Swiss-Prot record:
The lineage of its organism: Eukaryota, Metazoa, Chordata, Craniata, Vertebrata. It comes from Danio rerio. The gene is reep2. It is found in: Membrane. This is Receptor expression-enhancing protein 2. It is a multi-pass membrane protein. GO terms for molecular function: microtubule binding; taste receptor binding.
Amino acid sequence: MVSWIISRMVVLAFGTLYPAYSSYKAVKTKNVKEYVKWMMYWIVFALFTTAETITDMLLSWFPFYFELKIAFVIWLLSPYTKGSSVLYRKFVHPTLSNKEREIDEYITQAKDRSYDTMMRFGRRGLNIAATAAVTAATKGQGVLSEKLRSFSMQDLTLIQNEDELQLEGGDDTHTAATLPRAKTATRTVRATPVPADTESQHSSRSDDQSDSRTEHSDEDAADKAPKRIAITRAAKKPAAAKTEQTTKTVKKAPKKKPTTANNVAESP
């Protein structure tokens, strides 16, 4: 693990950052020798990175693998060994010059095929997206219609409840409006002065009512037997009174006044 960390640090520092800065200096000074040197190095280092990805997966178990990789990077950069220029001139340049046409043909074919494949996949992706959008829209319309129906039913129930509440509120306001009127009417009736005649009439009526109440209370206090005796006596008295009245009328018959003719005859 420690060797892997050290190897990665060495590759990044000495294999990438330092050659990048040296290439910048070569471009700035326009030195052809340095420019060619670092161009050869970058070609070899690109091949090294591609081979490194494969060897890290296959040969990482090999002992001293990471130490050998550090030594190889230093060999490429050393101005004494000039490993990058040696590898490029002996192996890379001859192989690339021999396979250059084939490589160019592969590149052009890859471009054309990549364009065709990209267009094909793009069309398929658009078709899939369109079908997905249509299906989602249909499902969404169904869900929205169901929700709208449920909302419409809820709105109708809410409207009915609001109408009932408004009617109840109108009744309450009507009763609340009539109550102050009734109170004001009673206040005006109480405030209006009562005439003296009406007061005397009311007082006489109240006296009569009090007398009648006292009489009723006396009658209730009396026993049933005295009531029967009083009733029989009262029944006999009117009959006697009627006979006395008839006799008096007979006795008190009016006397006839003497006429003028009788007066003349009686006169001598």
